[in-house]
Amino acid sequence: MFNCFLLNNESIIFTIMKSEEDFVETHLKEVEGASIWESPSNIALVKYWGKYGTQYPQNPSLSFTLSKCITKTSISFAPKEIKNRDFSFDFKFEGNNSPAFHPKIQTFLERIDCYVPFVRQHHLKIESVNSFPHSSGIASSASAMSALALGIMSM
């Protein structure tokens, strides 16, 4: 599908609607590498009260980006030694092994698997640090998942 729009009688903006297949990596490659990404956090002024479905909020919320409060996530990756369909990763938060975060990371990887199937072929070493205190009311999981997503897309 192809659309064009007239903006202020001066500029034309073109958009091309793509199908889901356009986003799926079909050339599976086993490589080694690393990436580092930073993502800003946010703080809610009007908080949402729960979710339904696949991460849809029950009600609207209002939040502000805190550009100085960042999560920095590094991902190093290499082909897995044992070939199987399981995700393979280690996670450190603030320099410490943090298995409590594994279920959230596992769920995230399962949700994006159809778009980045090559991730299953690699072992990931994920390390994350915040420039702000954890559990302080600042949305650290949002910035952490953003930085993780950017890192995976850089593989």
Where are these regions (language model features)?
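Active-site nucleophile and cofactor-binding loops and adjacent substrate-binding regions
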Residues: I138-S140
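Short, positively charged and aromatic/hydrophobic N-terminal segments
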Residues: L7-N8, I12-I13
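Short amphipathic alpha-helical face segments that pack within enzyme cores
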Residues: S143-G151
